[in-house]
Regions:
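N-terminal Rossmann-fold NAD(P) dinucleotide-binding loop
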Residues: 12-13
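Rossmann-like NAD(P)-binding element
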Residues: 51-113
């Protein structure tokens, strides 16, 4: 079984590394547009195989999509970071063009693949890939909620001094400031988190989660890569091994939660077919209001893409 990661930067290379270490696929292809870059990263990862004791083959390719043919899953991390002076619309146009080009070539060589988008702005780039791929929406989805939830759980584990393994949580909505936390659905070994932590402290952890990506940027001067790469690999594993895992995923909504024609983070079941079910939670009025506010923010950005010539539906 083959899995491809497009984009050999920090996130893509980390994803490939995790896939290899956990032997999630027999063959892992790392592809990048920069000459020799993916080959170098792939070789470096492969040279850890005798140390980490895995058999997954890791190879690199410079923009040769024929090497990706027959991939069960393709992770797309390609895109440029927002630079000083660059408007939001400029960033959307640039990265949508990149995602469109990549998606076209991915589908040409792997028409039955599932596509996991990691490129930012996440929700709208997933939409761009869906418009380009012209396949069922259950096969094109985005990684955001797995990362955001991992951050939330890790912060709670620090505050409560418990194992992060015992914390279960769900976040919904867009990736970023408009994400929707659901403390009612956050538990520690089945115990509601609201019984273990004061509301003020919980709210502070939620705010830290919303700004989690920015916190890393402020410390490093660049975006995170370990957690995003591992989060993408976890989604790939759920698909490849048909695990039926329940993950918050950027999915195409067609009436669920009263929302239509929008990519938004919601709980889903991930298995060999991609998104096998969108799970509708019973939200209270406050949670619904936050979700609709988040949806409106995402819809605004999607409309920016709709008004561009970058991608035609």
């Amino acid at each position: 079984m083959k899995v491809t990661v497009v984009g050999a930067g920090n996130v893509g290379a980390t994803c490939a590394d995790v896939l290899a270490k956990r032997e999630i696929a027999n063959e892992i292809v790392l592809l990048d547009i920069k000459e020799g870059f993916a080959e170098g990263k792939a070789l470096d990862i492969w040279e850890t195989s005798p140390i980490n004791l895995y058999d997954s083959r890791v190879t690199g390719s410079t923009n040769d999509y024929s090497k990706t043919a027959g991939s069960e899953v393709v992770v797309i991390t390609s895109g440029l970071p927002r630079k000083p002076g660059m408007s939001r619309d400029d960033l959307i146009a640039t990265n949508a063009g990149i995602v469109k080009s990549v998606t076209e070539q991915v589908i040409e060589h792997s028409p039955d693949t599932k596509i996991v988008i990691v490129s930012n702005p996440l929700d709208v780039m997933t939409y761009a890939a869906y418009l380009t791929a012209k396949v069922d929406s259950n096969r094109v989805f985005g990684m955001a909620g797995v990362l955001d939830t991992a951050r939330y759980r890790s912060f709670l584990a620090l505050e409560l001094n418990v194992s992060p393994k015992d914390i279960q949580a769900v976040l919904m909505g867009g990736h970023g400031d408009t994400m929707v936390p659901l403390p009612r659905y956050t538990t520690v070994s089945g115990i509601p988190v609201t019984e273990l932590i004061e509301t003020e402290k919980l709210n502070s952890i939620i705010e830290r989660t919303k700004k989690g990506g920015g916190e890393i940027v402020n410390l490093l001067g660049t975006s995170a890569w370990y957690a995003p790469g591992a989060a993408a690999a976890q989604m790939v594993e759920a698909i490849v091994r048909d695990q039926k895992r329940i993950f918050p995923t950027c999915a195409w909504l067609q009436g669920e939660y009263g929302l239509k024609d929008i990519y938004l983070g919601v709980p889903t079941k991930l298995g060999s077919k991609g998104i096998e079910e969108i799970i509708e939670l019973q939200l209270n009025s406050d949670e619904k209001e936050l979700l609709y506010r988040s949806a409106n923010a995402v819809k605004e950005v999607m409309e920016v893409l709709d008004n561009m010539d970058t991608i035609s539906a």
